[in-house]
A protein has these predicted regions:
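N-terminal hydrophobic or amphipathic helices/low-complexity stretches enriched
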Residues: 1-22
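Active-site metal-coordination/substrate-binding segment of hydrolases
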Residues: 65-135
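Short glycine-centered, acidic/aromatic-flanked micro-motifs in structured strand/loop junctions
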Residues: 22-24, 59, 75, 109
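A non-catalytic alpha/beta surface segment that caps or lines the substrate-entry region
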Residues: 25-69
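Predominant activation on well-ordered alpha-helical scaffold segments within soluble catalytic domains
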Residues: 13, 17, 37, 120-128
């Protein structure tokens, strides 16, 4: 069972949970960058990954939107890594231990990395969704 499976919107929190499984502290973004590249490849999207592990994924426009202005969804992949005193967690190797309490998502004993982790999750969910017309 996924920790966030009852959170809405489901696809956003599916991707957020996937992101949280991957170590992605500042300066340690190769794995999360490669995850995004794998996502692009799986969906047949063009992409660019640079030497700093930045990734741009291109999704073709929906029929009828080919000449509409381009839309960019942007977020950063890294997180600030902090933990409570006494918590054993290696941010270089370990994903986050998530929980949901009283409707709030948290990471047990560590920072959540939700500030732009959720932005990346929303972008992936939108890229994955074929039902939303887009430029």
């Amino acid at each position: 069972m996924r920790v966030l499976e009852n959170c809405e919107p489901k696809r956003v929190f599916y991707y957020f949970e996937e992101i949280c499984k991957i170590p992605h502290g500042s300066g340690n973004t190769k794995q999360i960058s490669d995850y995004l590249v794998d996502f692009a490849k799986k969906h047949g999207f063009d992409y660019v990954q640079d030497e700093m592990n930045n990734v741009v994924i291109y999704k073709p426009a929906s029929k009828g939107y080919e000449n509409a202005p381009t839309v960019i969804l942007q977020g950063h992949m890294d997180m600030v890594c902090e933990k409570r005193p006494g918590v054993e967690h290696d941010f270089e190797k370990d994903g986050l231990n998530l929980s949901v309490r009283d409707g709030y998502i948290s990471a047990n004993g560590t920072t959540l990395g939700g500030d732009d982790g959720i932005a990346v999750a929303y972008a992936l969910a939108l890229l994955d969704d074929e039902s939303i017309p887009h430029p």
